[in-house]
Amino acid sequence: METHIKTVEFERPNMLAEAQSGASCVAHAWAKVPPALSREERDALKARIKRLLKERNAVLVAHYYVDADLQDLAEETGGCVSDSLEMARFGRDHSAKTLVVAGVRFMGETAKILSPEKTVLMPDLDATCSLDLGCPPDTFAAFCDAHPDRTVVVYANTSAAVKARADWMVTSSIGLKIVQHLHEQGQKILWAPDRHLGSYIQQQTGADMLLWQGSCLVHDEFKGVELDLLRAEHPHAKVLVHPESPPSVVAQADVVGSTSQLIAAAQSLPADAFIVATDNGILHKMRMAAPGKRFIEAPTAGNSATCKSCAHCPWMAMNALTNLAEVLETGRNEIHVDPQIGQQAVRCITRMLDFAAREKTTVRPQGDLAANTQLFQGVGPA
């Protein structure tokens, strides 16, 4: 296949610099993670949150990467535990007047864009995303202006302002199909922000893609050399990889897919053990979906003392029972999206939703498990 990958170097803020103040600094994000609670404290908070959800006519929507207690609480109260797009869909379609989003800020923004009439709260407004931070709206707009001949396709993990500049928003499971569709129409793509996901999609489709050079703090730390050593220790384990991971990791995958797709693989594939290269928050749902199977965390670069994420997003970890209860009691931490930006951003989201409704397709598994493609029907993001 002829390749048409282009990358560009440009000056932009180092949003992950250790010296930076605020929760965009990784060290500061970890410092904001609430302390562990006793069983008694957790049970008391859960009971309090359940009462507050009813009193506020609110529903809890949580991502697969947040604390297991929050995932369980969402399901126990009629909420939703899913990927970011399904979180927004669920909130849009639910009758609750208040959506409480346990995740990171772009998820709350997307929920607000799709449900502008509803109140959207988050446990901590500082819970952000390295992909979002690494794609500043003004710099991105200038980048787009410099390449007016390209169709702008952005990943869900971006701010509302970046989405407002895009022609399409995609998720990790529908991105392949949308880019293939655009490629067949002869369109050249400007892709942002994740370079690994963009490279993976380009290699699968052959599209002409200009890649923004962003990456996920968690997935970028998975390394092919360490994974190869772990596979030697567990030769019968299947490898599940999120496509935000580096190419050396994706190349070793039995299944490449979004969070929902990897959970489906863990549940449905005939294997007793899986090596999982994505945020370890997903392991709670995988163990629930496949209780008789073993899940092994893929190693990250500099495991233990020197890793930045150690396979868990520090901003996802900022969501906890304590600040969830506080936000329900006070009504603070409300997500606001400028109406003009929201009206512009909703177009690229709706375009993807309409396309997905027509296509009902997903990222295809790689390698030995290609025959299991039918297991991964549906649309869901990171």
From Swiss-Prot:
GO terms for cellular component: cytosol. Iminosuccinate binds at H63, S84, Y155, A156, N157, S172, H242, P243, E244, T259. This is Quinolinate synthase. Its EC number is 2.5.1.72. HAMAP family: NadA_type1. Belongs to the quinolinate synthase family. Type 1 subfamily. Catalyzes the condensation of iminoaspartate with dihydroxyacetone phosphate to form quinolinate. The keyword Metal-binding applies. GO terms for molecular function: 4 iron, 4 sulfur cluster binding; metal ion binding; quinolinate synthetase A activity. Binds 1 [4Fe-4S] cluster per subunit. Pathway: Cofactor biosynthesis; NAD(+) biosynthesis; quinolinate from iminoaspartate: step 1/1. It holds the Pfam family NadA. It is an enzyme of class 2 (transferase). It is found in: Cytoplasm. [4Fe-4S] cluster binds at C129, C216, C313. GO terms for biological process: 'de novo' NAD biosynthetic process from L-aspartate. Its cofactor is [4Fe-4S] cluster. It comes from the Bacteria. Keywords: 4Fe-4S, Cytoplasm, Iron, Iron-sulfur, Metal-binding, Pyridine nucleotide biosynthesis, Transferase. It catalyses: iminosuccinate + dihydroxyacetone phosphate = quinolinate + phosphate + 2 H2O + H(+). Gene3D superfamilies: NadA-like (3.40.50.10800). It comes from Ralstonia nicotianae (strain ATCC BAA-1114 / GMI1000) (Ralstonia solanacearum).
